[in-house]
């Protein structure tokens, strides 16, 4: 049946929604704050510039792009009119393909992408065809029609308006939780609640996995002595950071839902897995100083894990666009690992106010200046670590662009050999 569907946000996700639903014969109305974005979308029957248009009449369904906050006025208006509000995730989970093939959902404050990619790699290594999709940058609706296990990264942005129970996932994991995205969610409770809504996507009697310290009803912890013993036997493994162990444990638990995972297959997958860039990515050294790109660390918790992984004699570059991070909480781990903090970008003064009395700290207007300062301070044996603990949007389009620029700066000063 043809429906009048309002697509809120016409970026990457909105475009994929329009492509998919146009093939289903629906009447599609796109809405965005950017006229340029609206014009760039094919398959729309009508286009509305939010802020200059009224909420349209006779809408059957609203599909919210992740960038549209769950309390956006048009979302709230739809809710008041009892119009269902969903995201591309809920649209995809209702397709026959998510009943035909096993599928897994992965959420958490940190480690989602690494776990998604590793689980996909693990299954393929075991001879089980699998494809990664979702918040990983591969819109879920663009992968309809491909056979194989679905491994879906799902963000709190995509879950925040999940109301209906859609029994599609063969298993799901909530990797961890830390203070984050308070520039998006109304408060920490709303952020946590959004993450928990992944349970609404589980098939009946399927497993909901959580991190070791978490205690939630109807859930199982991803850590097990069995996995620890397997990892300890992997003598030929490259060093595994503690947080990556959690990611591997989660993938192991989920993979067991579709068949027994042999220790040999698990260890082979770890040996052959290439972690995505910008996650404790070692860039090399010059004059005995090591350089590490951890641009993906956009939360205080991620910075803590990075510092614990690197260990000591760290010169850490923090800063960017604040997401409500608890910077005073870094004081303890900084005192154990760090020689100097360089606070850069939009929230550099916020970081300085929180930490300057506890550890040597220098302010920097941008990443280029921060690298120059770090090069001046660093001595043989030190590690310069970009682990911002903030979003990148004060000066960059994404953490990837920020990380790529950091790598360029390091190459230009011939730090890598």
UniProtKB/Swiss-Prot annotation:
Annotated EC: 6.3.2.9
Keywords, comma-separated and alphabetical: ATP-binding, Cell cycle, Cell division, Cell shape, Cell wall biogenesis/degradation, Cytoplasm, Ligase, Nucleotide-binding, Peptidoglycan synthesis
Annotated catalysed reactions: UDP-N-acetyl-alpha-D-muramoyl-L-alanine + D-glutamate + ATP = UDP-N-acetyl-alpha-D-muramoyl-L-alanyl-D-glutamate + ADP + phosphate + H(+)
Keyword Electron transport: no
GO MF entries: ATP binding; UDP-N-acetylmuramoylalanine-D-glutamate ligase activity
GO CC, alphabetical: cytoplasm
UniProt KW Cell cycle keyword: yes
Residues bound to ATP: 108-114
Class in the EC hierarchy, top level: ligase
Subcellular location: Cytoplasm
Superkingdom as given in the UniProt entry: Bacteria
Pathway: Cell wall biogenesis; peptidoglycan biosynthesis
PANTHER family, alphabetized: UDP-N-ACETYLMURAMOYLALANINE--D-GLUTAMATE LIGASE (PTHR43692:SF1)
Function text: Cell wall formation. Catalyzes the addition of glutamate to the nucleotide precursor UDP-N-acetylmuramoyl-L-alanine (UMA).
Family as reported in the entry's similarity comment: Belongs to the MurCDEF family.
Name this polypeptide is given: UDP-N-acetylmuramoylalanine--D-glutamate ligase
Upper taxonomic lineage: Bacteria, Pseudomonadati, Chlamydiota, Chlamydiia, Chlamydiales
């Amino acid at each position: 049946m043809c429906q009048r569907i309002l697509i809120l946000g016409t970026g990457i996700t909105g475009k994929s929604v329009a492509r998919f639903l146009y093939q289903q014969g629906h009447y599609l109305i796109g809405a965005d704050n950017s006229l340029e974005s609206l014009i760039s979308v094919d398959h729309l029957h009508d286009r509305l510039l939010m802020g200059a248009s009224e909420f349209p009449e006779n809408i059957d369904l609203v599909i919210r792009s992740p960038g549209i906050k769950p309390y956006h006025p048009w979302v709230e208006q739809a809710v008041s009119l009892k119009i269902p509000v969903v995201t591309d995730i809920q649209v995809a989970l209702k397709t026959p393909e998510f009943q035909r093939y096993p599928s897994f959902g992965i959420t958490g404050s940190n480690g989602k992408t690494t776990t998604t990619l590793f689980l996909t790699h693990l299954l393929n290594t075991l001879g089980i065809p699998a494809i990664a999709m979702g918040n990983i940058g591969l819109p879920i609706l663009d992968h309809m029609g491909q056979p194989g296990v679905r491994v879906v990264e799902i963000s709190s942005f995509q879950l925040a308006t999940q109301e209906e129970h859609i029994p599609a996932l063969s298993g799901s994991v909530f990797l961890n939780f830390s203070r984050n995205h308070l520039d998006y969610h109304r408060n920490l409770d709303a952020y946590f609640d959004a993450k928990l809504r992944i349970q609404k996507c589980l098939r009946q009697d399927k497993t909901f996995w959580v991190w070791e310290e978490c205690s939630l009803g109807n859930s199982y912890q991803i850590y097990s002595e069995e996995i620890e013993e397997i990892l300890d036997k992997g003598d030929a493994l490259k060093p595994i950071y503690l947080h990556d162990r959690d990611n591997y444990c989660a993938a192991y638990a989920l993979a067991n839902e579709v068949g027994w995972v042999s220790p040999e297959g698990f260890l082979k997958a770890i040996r052959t897995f290439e972690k995505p860039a910008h996650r404790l990515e070692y860039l090399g050294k010059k004059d005995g100083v090591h350089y590490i790109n951890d641009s993906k660390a956009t939360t205080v918790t991620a910075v803590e894990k990075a510092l614990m992984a690197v260990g000591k004699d760290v010169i850490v570059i923090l800063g960017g666009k604040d997401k409500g991070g608890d910077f005073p909480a870094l004081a303890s781990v900084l005192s154990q690992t760090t020689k100097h903090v360089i606070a850069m970008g939009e929230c550099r003064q916020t970081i300085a106010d929180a930490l300057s009395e506890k550890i040597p700290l220098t302010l920097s207007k941008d990443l280029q200046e921060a690298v120059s300062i770090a090069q001046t301070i660093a001595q043989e044996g030190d590690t310069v670590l970009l682990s911002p603990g903030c979003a990148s949007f004060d000066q960059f389009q994404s953490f990837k662009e920020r990380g790529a620029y950091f790598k360029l700066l390091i190459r230009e000063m011939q730090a890598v050999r």
